[in-house]
Amino acid sequence: MTKEVVVESFELDHTIVKAPYVRLISEEVGPVGDIITNFDIRLIQPNENAIDTAGLHTIEHLLAKLIRQRINGLIDCSPFGCRTGFHMIMWGKQDATEIAKVIKSSLEAIAGGVTWEDVPGTTIESCGNYKDHSLHSAQEWAKLILSQGISDNAFERHIV
């Protein structure tokens, strides 16, 4: 018998969200009491556009570094297959407003001055697709996203 599962992100009505936003998906408690929080970091309005893979890949690498410089507890920040944003998994209870501020600050760094030397993991030894990066694209997407404002609410615009 196959176990019935519900995947929250496929239950979300993508036609009513208002990107860019940070949305708390869930807080889960592990078997020994550890808490993890899962966030939807939606940078692009679903079904209207998608970040090109090279730009998204570079944003991913930069966020891995920049988020950790701004807040403790990051487990992972991985892109959605639809290329409209990221899942962000954190240790402990976290607040969507604080995470939105961290994402905003990280995107500001990407938009305003990081250089190729600042992008971690861009060698054949450190990346599984090291040729598929674009700092220019990452910076242009960051500027566009920031111009729209980062909300801490997926359904009503509340810019941080």
From Swiss-Prot:
Q: Which UniProt keywords apply?
A: Autoinducer synthesis, Iron, Lyase, Metal-binding, Quorum sensing
UniProt xrefs under Gene3D superfamilies? S-ribosylhomocysteinase (LuxS) (3.30.1360.80)
Provide the GO biological process annotations.
Answer: quorum sensing
Q: Which cofactor does it need?
A: Fe cation
Offer an example of a GO molecular function term for this protein.
iron ion binding
> Any idea of its EC number?
4.4.1.21
Explain how, and how many, cofactor molecules are bound.
Binds 1 Fe cation per subunit.
Q: Name one Pfam family in it.
A: LuxS
Q: Which InterPro entries match?
A: LuxS_sf, Metalloenz_LuxS/M16, S-ribosylhomocysteinase
- Where Fe cation binds, per the record, is at 57, 61, 127
Q: Which reaction does it catalyse?
A: S-(5-deoxy-D-ribos-5-yl)-L-homocysteine = (S)-4,5-dihydroxypentane-2,3-dione + L-homocysteine
By its UniProt entry, which PANTHER family does this protein fall under?
S-RIBOSYLHOMOCYSTEINE LYASE
Give the protein's function: Involved in the synthesis of autoinducer 2 (AI-2) which is secreted by bacteria and is used to communicate both the cell density and the metabolic potential of the environment. The regulation of gene expression in response to changes in cell density is called quorum sensing. Catalyzes the transformation of S-ribosylhomocysteine (RHC) to homocysteine (HC) and 4,5-dihydroxy-2,3-pentadione (DPD).
Similarity annotation? Belongs to the LuxS family.
Q: Which HAMAP family match?
A: LuxS
Complexes and interactors: Homodimer.
Name of the featured protein: S-ribosylhomocysteine lyase
Q: Which organism is it from?
A: Streptococcus agalactiae serotype V (strain ATCC BAA-611 / 2603 V/R)
